[in-house]
Structures are given as structure tokens and as C-alpha cells.
Amino acid sequence: MDMLQFFRDALVQETGRHVDNDDFDALFSELGADPLVGVAVIERVTNKTVEKAPRAARPPREAPLPRGNVRNAFQDACSHVQEFLRKAGSANFWSRVYPAQRQLVLAFVNDAFDRLGCSLADMPVGTIVTYPRGVLDKHRRVFDGAIFEILADGGLVNVDPELGAIRTSTVVDKTPPQQILATIILEHPQFANLHRLLNVTGSQFAECLTGRLDPIKLLFGRSKDLLQDFYTNAPMSLAASLHLVAVIKRLLADGEYRPGKSIDILEVGAGLGGTTRFVVEALIEAQVPFRYVYTDISASFFAASKNRYKSLPPGSSMEFLVLDVEIPPPETLLGGFDVVVSTNCIHATRNLGVSCSNVRKLLRGGGFFALIEFTSRMYWLDLVFGLLDGWWLFEDGRKHCTVDETVWEEKLQLSGFSDVLWADVEGDDKSSLQLLVACTD
């Protein structure tokens, strides 16, 4: 294989799109490749490694998980939600942790305004608060979609539909962000790494807004371990994963699983593999053979998981595949899976309905879609992920990329799913990160 062909294949596998010869005159960014993908393409060419094509579609067969039992399994697992929250250290989050987190987020925003020469503390009452000088045009969406709301939530502005954000008489809390951060880490150690992740961008928010610093390099460079920890060990992530595992274990218990049948699972946007670990460990513990297809829009995330799962029990396998959930899946994957899993991925697509419809095409009758997403507005997420393009891709009428359970229910049902289930818990006991299960029958 010549080097040009190898480069083309590497770019196709990293971006999931067709690349013509004419495309080689284009910039990486025009081909859908961010800096991380560019690095991954170069590594592929250097190491001469390519992914195998997806396995041919399996013929239709009886699902190993009898229809109807998914609902029972989910309801049974829901009775243990408070146990999951306690085990994960996320119980009573809204009264115990959120007030300090809210204070920290507002402090980072105030600090950014100060460093951009637009001090809110010195701003007269009635002043219209707008984008500080030097903010990149593309980051104005962070202000429109989050920053002005954060200021309103903190009482520092009132938002008028015509005039915009107007400074109030509320005094700015001048407590330094690093002092608040130190207190949170001391008093809420389970959330320490989550708030350290917030600090990565929050403490340098002004520099990111003006383009002096690249948030992608900040988050995926030396802070990559904090991202991995967030997806795997952050209390709300752990609680949601425990809930998902409980559903799977319940389905495999009491003879509901048909012995001798392997389970076909596909994960959309597997990324760093935080959810994968819980699901695979549950299947291995239950001694259930499985085929697990680990997908992401870029293969740059695959290396660590390939190494982690290179030795699986007999009868089980893991495949790695570049998959863009925003386009129809390849024919080889249609109706090929009993379970599709996705954590913190689908929200970052242009159209929830299109993405959910494409997921539905992957499932066979009796299968289900396990979706883990933030369904409560968490402003700290905007200070971290709001600096990335994927946070603002939506073109389907959403006001923000995160939506509540009722919106997910509507989109999933319109996409061909039947029941959409979630833990109906409100108040201090509600988790900000929810497991939703959508059934196919």
C-alpha cells in the first residue's frame, strides 16, 4: 500500500467520512479533523496501523433477552437508586455540594470578566453587560448560552428579552476562586477531581475565550486523566453506571437470559471507555459470552481500551470501529445488536431525532437503548465543555445541548422506540446524570 493510500485510509478511519484525492488540498479542519484527530492520523501513518472493516451483519435471530423483561429489570433497579447514590458519594448533592459548586462557577466567571478588563464589581447598576473586548466570535455562543444565565442565576444581572443582560445592585462576591476550590476539595473529596477538571478551564477561562490558550490542548493534554476520571469515577457518573449494571445483571438473573446465546452490544461514543468497563465486568462476572463493538467518531480513543481488553474469556470479543451516529449506520450493523449503550454523547449531535433514529436502526427486536445523559442544567459543564465546538452543534431547536427527560422521551419515541424509562425522582435525591432506557417493542 503506498503512503498516499495509507494516509487516506487513516483519515477515513479517524473522521468516519469519505476522502477523495481532491480533499488532500484541504485543511484538516475542513475535513472534520480537530487537532487530536490530526495527531492520531499522523500516528497511524507512522505506525502503519489500520482498523479492520466491520464484521458482516449477523442473520436475524431470537434475542437472548426475552421481550418485556427490560421494563421489569429497570423498575427493579430503580428501587436501588438511592443505594447507588450513597455508594457513589452523590447522595444529597443538591443541598450538600451544589451551593459551593455554584459559588465556584460564578467566581470563575467574575474572574474572567476582571481579566478581560470588564469588572462586574465596578460596573454601575443598569449597565448593559455584553461580550468583553477580545472574545473570539465563536465563543460568543458561550455567553449567549451560558455565561449570562450564570450571572442571572447569581443575581448579578437581569436578562431583558430586548436589552439583554443588565447589571443589578447585587454586590460581587470577591472570594478568590482558588480559595473556594480548596474548600470544596477539602469538604467534598469525592468531587475533588471533578472540580479540579473545572479548574483546568475555569482558572484560564479568559485566555481560552480570547484564543491565547487552546481548550482542546488543556483538556486532552496533561488533564486527560481528569477527563477519564470524570467519565468513570465522578460520583454522578459512577451512580449512573451502577444503575446500568444493575439493569443488566437483573436481566441476566433468574433464568431470564437464554443460556448459550451471546449478547451483542454496541457502544456509541465510547471515548475513554468509562462506561465500557462497568458493562464488560458485569458480563464477565455473569459468565455471559458477548460481542462488544466499541465505537467513537475518532479512533484516537481506541488504543488504551484495545490494550485493556486484549484478553477476554472464550466466546467473547471486542471490536473497534469508527462510527458517526449522525449518519445512517452501515448495512453491516443494521439490526445487529441486543443493546446499544451511550454515555454523554448523543447530546453533542446536531439533531437528537436523527441520532436516536440511527441508534434504533442498530437494534434488533426486543433490544434496548441505554442512554446516560445530564438532564439537569449544570453550569460547570459550560465552563469546561462549552469551549468546545461539539457543545454547540445542535440545530434542532434546542436552547442548550443538555435537555430534560421529557425531551429525550419525545425524541426517542418519534425515533421508533416504545417505552422510555427513567428513575422518577425529584428534589435532593435526583441525580443530575440520568440513565434512560428506550425499548424497541
Swiss-Prot record:
An annotated Gene Ontology molecular function: methyltransferase activity
Organism expressing this protein natively: Ustilaginoidea virens
UniProt KW keywords: Methyltransferase, Transferase
Region Methyltransferase (CMeT) domain, residue ranges: 266-368
Top enzyme category: transferase
Involved pathway(s): Secondary metabolite biosynthesis
Source taxonomy: Eukaryota, Fungi, Dikarya, Ascomycota, Pezizomycotina
Biological process terms in GO annotation: biosynthetic process; methylation
Matches recorded under InterPro entries: Methyltransf_12, Polyketide_Synthase, SAM-dependent_MTases_sf
Protein name: Polyketide methyltransferase ustM
EC number(s) stated in the UniProt entry for this protein: 2.1.1.-
Gene3D superfamilies for this protein: Vaccinia Virus protein VP39 (3.40.50.150)
Family to which this protein belongs: Belongs to the methyltransferase superfamily.
Function (record text): Polyketide methyltransferase; part of the gene cluster that mediates the biosynthesis of ustilaginoidins, dimeric gamma-naphthopyrones isolated from different fungal species. The first step in the biosynthesis of ustilaginoidins is the production of gamma-naphthopyrone precursor YWA1 by the non-reducing polyketide synthase ustP, via condensation of one acetyl-CoA starter unit with 6 malonyl-CoA units. YWA1 is then probably substrate of the ustZ to yield norrubrofusarin via a dehydration reaction.
Keyword Methyltransferase belongs to the record: yes
